[in-house]
């Protein structure tokens, strides 16, 4: 793993002075390094990577000022290479202290970095801290313990991870687990704590930090704490003692998600919802697992995604089965199959060992196929095979860092023979590209009439051992296993004299196949079942397309077929409720809606659209108060764009009917008057004074170029997001000039403007739901 000379980061010590008005941060980063070479060579130079917009002013090596060069990395966009020759070489296992002083300016905010008044974000992916290795190499990210001292010139609460000391403008964080420095500044959050003591464990503090300012979030805070208590308890029981005595779930205005040991970032929407839905539970349970895997033990080496990401995803599935039962566990794995299916069908996926986060399909493959492979290990080689191996590693003292090869060795055990079954399985699924495509033939009764035989075939690659089921005319289910070689044949026999009416290979979709159903474009029969049937996910996608085309009766037929095959498919039940509503079938709407909500945990799609359907039903009853409550829940869910648009439309309609529409205060109305005048002044500096340019550079540039002759905003309603932000629904009318043709364009539509309150007044921070055309 180590090269001829290869520094490892042992520790970070960072001081950061944030200057939000200047969109800048002054940093002093101290890296404690060790030459970890395994080839006996001394290190003669140091190469670090840093954000290209960071201007390095000094480099000290072991306390001595050292000359350096800084140039853009030709391979990584937005990254620079800082390099220096060492005055004195560093022998193998020798240590080096490197201190960099620099100023980083973030001119345009993005998902990894932002420095603006009242809202800052610096994540490791932005390279705001110098590193030796990028996450895209076989080494992996340079995770290590750290201290981070942050000084803030301006308003906002400072957050990072680990033990916190200090309040107000200067705060220090000490993280003893393996991580990388990051920070966030946002609106003052409401902090709620709970002390738990999992069975046989030491006390652990759970904390939520919510920036959400709206009333009624107390229940959701408690639901999040309840879920975290169960998740942490599950992992203490499954993996051993917790590496940390605290877990924090913190929300943020940017809706950014980020996982670090003991601290989990979620969007503000998570705290606005009326339940902790399935996707958030998946995310939280995966995040907590990474406190053990990656936090306690560093993850390094080729194929690290298998351990760092696929393994926590698999463990999340075990939590679902433990927490909600077998049906919920099956739906968890069904979501993995559905998410991976398009990539499998495209046949463009790489072997798991070769994948790195830079790959466009990395997370689709690793979080889904990678987790399914771990599930296959448990199914084929015995329940808890994976957990037993992981717990052995975590409770031992011989494996740090944790590598794929270390996990492989522990799984296989003392028998390292290449033909050992688990050894061959891992080689096939981790080290090779495997694309199975399983089909089953018609069942045939034997001559004695006491059994039925089915021929099986693998049209794709990879040896498989797969379950096969038969359904008799009396409804009896018979199950057996069959081994099918790569591109080969197999068979199964069902011992029954009863008529077999249906057979299916791999009914639970254990294997990530390239196809699951009849391919109309293929002359080769290609289906997992006889009689042939369409996979429920494909039926759902077709029904959704028909719904968007307003072919409601055809969509209804598809969805009735879908839920008959898979009653626990909550999203299909939810779409069916929407279709029945469009058809005016109120009883059928209520029935499908209830079936969707009965599936626990509730998917986000159901969380959002169920509230829309409830709002629509309330409007038909002219129960405008109930409609307002439902649409507010739909808006808070932040499920998907169409759902949020429908929520805003419904809120405006129902609040208007109640004559209780939420209007902003006079200062917000005055802001829009100022913005209209600024835009029509056609002066960039005047516009920039009312907009956070780093957040909306394209908006500011667009106004400066098109120079609208008309810009009118009609304020419709407003809602307080947190102590710093307000969302304002507006109707917008503009007369702009086409930059190519010079023609005048009259544009109208609606938008949601997000305003931020700063020391100088309201400024535009974000534009959501922009439908101006």
Which residues does each predicted region cover?
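Extended, low-hydrophobicity, Ser/Thr/Pro/Gly-biased non-transmembrane segments
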Residues: 87-88, 97-194
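Exposed beta-sheet edge and beta->alpha loop/turn motif
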Residues: 471-473, 624, 723-773
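Juxtacatalytic substrate-recognition/specificity segment
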Residues: 148, 192-305, 315, 319, ...
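Acidic/His/Gly-enriched intrinsically disordered linker/tail segments
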Residues: 303-372, 376, 380-381, 398, ...
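Short solvent-exposed beta->alpha transition segments
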Residues: 405-409, 422-426, 655-729
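A surface-exposed beta-strand-loop module
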Residues: 54-118, 486-499
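Beta-strand-rich binding/interaction modules
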Residues: 57-60, 418-423, 435-439, 443-507
